[in-house]
Amino acid sequence: MNAMNAEGRTFKGVLYFGLIVTEQGPKVIEYNCRLGDPEAQVCLSLLETDLLEIMNAVIDGTLENVEFSNREGGAIVVMMCSGGYPEAYAKGKEITGLKEDGQNDSFHYIFHSGTAFKDGKYVSNGGRVLGFVCLGDDVKDAQDKVYANIDKVAFENSFYRHDIGGKR
């Protein structure tokens, strides 16, 4: 940011920092000029304020005039990945448990990150395939909902973490 300012360039946008907590404290592992994925999926699921209004205010320099509003409660996103990810993984595995619109009524949202629609079926097409979002009265409630239902959707060699939102 200092280098951009020194060149007379103004940054207006989103800065995303990927962090990890280590024994030595938090460390930055990446940063981007975009929303993080799947982090944005869970955060935006709670946002009630129009995102376009927010981004226009960022561009116009009037963000202090935007009244932010979020849903009450908590949210959680759990990613379903292809076996082998983040290394080599197979593509084209049929995904079961999705409706024609790519959703499942057990979840508030299912975000397609690495899917394709071939021959009338959803198939895996990446490492991080689906992001399952549930909302709840609090994070624990959302966590209970997502883990109670995530096995309703599956594909060969799929896996997901069991510790999102705290140890289970």
What are these regions (language model features)?
Residues 1-16, 32-105:
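Active-site "cap" helix and flanking loop/linker of ATP-utilizing ligase/carboxylase catalytic domains
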Residues 12, 24, 71, 123-125:
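Short coil/turn motifs at beta-sheet boundaries
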Residues 15-16, 27, 43, 47-51, ...:
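General structural feature for long, well-ordered alpha-helical segments within catalytic domains
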Residues 17-21, 26-35, 114:
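Short beta-strand elements
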Residues 18-20, 79, 96, 111-114, ...:
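Residues in well-ordered beta-strands of folded domains
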Residues 22-24, 36-38, 81-85, 137, ...:
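Generic structural motif
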Residues 90-131:
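Generic long, charged, amphipathic alpha-helical segments
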Residues 115-119, 123-168:
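Generic C-terminus detector
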